């Protein structure tokens, strides 16, 4: 999968599916499920590392998890999902050179193909243009931007006329700066629907209604593994309960070495 495929999908009216992964196990599952894009999001700071925000996530941690995600794929590189990784807080806000170094570190040391960053401030637009000149594809992110949590909070954005006009202007600027797609997080559905028609690049929604060019979800939310479930992410599986019950069954077993008599470990099948 390539970035140009996503633009083609928009023209064809094909929904784009984006799921997060944070290690080899999660990426192998997401790949087998058929996602178009795997996002190594800095949300791993909350989902995996136990932080209350994404702000503590470092570039070294993003590289560690991105490499693990890329090692988990089974298919040949040309048939793998597109891998996009987040640039963590303060890895691109402090200047173009630092942003190029951060993005280059992630892409040179993994098979990731693109980076995602938040906002459309003038300094951010300069960073995006510089990255693209260096041959690094960029996905934008507007609406609820978790790296601005102390300024904007974890709440729905673009609720009034001024902020709605700004998000339309920002999306246009991200497109003109060269972004291949934009994530819209936690904004009114009618605004996302209008914005989708306002720009030529794909609009990927999360908590932004169903009328987007695609949807992105945190995999742990879909599987019901998250401790704090977002209001816009309905779980499709009671994952925590299933895992807890399975582990309890093993813990309470009289024979901890017991193997399911109908299953031989040597005959287990891989999705590869």
From Swiss-Prot:
CDD domains: KPHMT-like. Mg(2+) binds at residues 42, 86, 118. Signal peptide: none annotated. Its main location: cytoplasm. Catalyzes the reversible reaction in which hydroxymethyl group from 5,10-methylenetetrahydrofolate is transferred onto alpha-ketoisovalerate to form ketopantoate. Belongs to the PanB family. This is 3-methyl-2-oxobutanoate hydroxymethyltransferase.
């Amino acid at each position: 999968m390539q970035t140009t495929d996503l633009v083609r999908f928009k023209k064809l009216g094909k929904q784009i599916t984006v799921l997060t992964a944070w290690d080899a196990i999660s990426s192998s599952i997401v790949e087998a499920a058929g996602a178009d894009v795997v996002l190594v999001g800095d949300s791993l700071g909350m989902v995996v590392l136990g932080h209350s925000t994404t702000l503590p996530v470092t570039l070294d941690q993003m590289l560690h998890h991105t490499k693990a995600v890329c090692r988990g794929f089974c298919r040949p590189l040309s048939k793998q999902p597109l891998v996009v990784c987040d640039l963590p807080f303060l890895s691109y806000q402090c200047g173009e050179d630092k942003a190029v170094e951060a993005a280059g570190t992630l892409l040179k040391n993994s098979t990731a193909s693109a980076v995602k960053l938040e906002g459309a401030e003038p300094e951010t637009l300069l960073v995006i243009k510089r990255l693209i000149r260096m041959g690094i594809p960029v996905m934008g992110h507007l609406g609820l931007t978790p790296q601005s949590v102390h300024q904007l909070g974890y709440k729905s954005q673009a609720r009034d006329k001024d902020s709605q006009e700004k998000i339309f202007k920002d999306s246009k600027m991200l497109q003109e700066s060269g972004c291949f797609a934009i994530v819209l997080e936690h904004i009114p559905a009618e605004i996302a629907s209008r914005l989708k028609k306002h720009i030529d690049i794909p609009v990927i929604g999360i908590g932004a209604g169903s009328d987007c060019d695609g949807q992105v979800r945190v995999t742990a939310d879909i599987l019901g593994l998250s401790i704090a479930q977002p209001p816009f992410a309905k779980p499709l599986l009671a994952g925590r309960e299933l895992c807890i019950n399975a582990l309890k069954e093993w813990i309470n077993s009289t024979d901890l070495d017991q193997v399911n008599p109908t299953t031989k470990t040597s005959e287990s099948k891989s999705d590869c």
